[in-house]
Amino acid sequence: MLRPPPPSSVLTASAAAARPPASVVQPQRQAAHRRRAETLRLRRVFEMFDRDGDGVITPAELSGALCRLGARGEAPPAAAALDAVVAAYIAPGMAGLRFAEFEALHAELAGLGGRQAVAAAEAEEEKEADMREAFGVFDEDGDGYISAAELQAVLSRMGLPEAACMARVRDMIAAADRDSDGRVDYEEFKAMMAAGN
């Protein structure tokens, strides 16, 4: 006659059957450990960037941290692209990024969004290079300014009637000349071109 197994062995056998094999559990534990370690690392970075310790990284604090790390200041178009990405993560009514937003921003920059941010920065750099090249066409002597005489010469080569009247050329310079020095520097040229688009 067969005897039924003792109740404790039935429970042990059913618990063992319900438990996933070690080959599944171990990678899950490792992944959870990596996530915790990454969160702790990000928390340390967040606290390092949050200079005043208020739990929010302002754009100024982020910019300062990136400067200290040597990742800011060399490519203004890339910096502008980064500023736009960061601004998208700042919650309405907040002065900066809280840890959860910082973590989400990090995830985007590390994943597909990071490649998109890089592509956007590269496109912005290309646009900047094109703008500098256009400025160079007008800045014939390369001194960093477009004078009325330089503008008149370029307009004349282009066959535009405005070149015939120096007063009209000076008016064109004055319209773009924000600091009233009688010539157009690169930033003024850029602002004029942006206003025209």
Curated annotation (Swiss-Prot):
Binding site for Ca(2+) 3: 177, 179, 181, 183, 188
Binding site for Ca(2+) 2: 139, 141, 143, 145, 150
Superkingdom of this protein's organism: Eukaryota
GO terms, molecular function: calcium ion binding
Any matching Pfam family: EF-hand_7
Role, per record: Potential calcium sensor.
Protein name, per record: Probable calcium-binding protein CML21
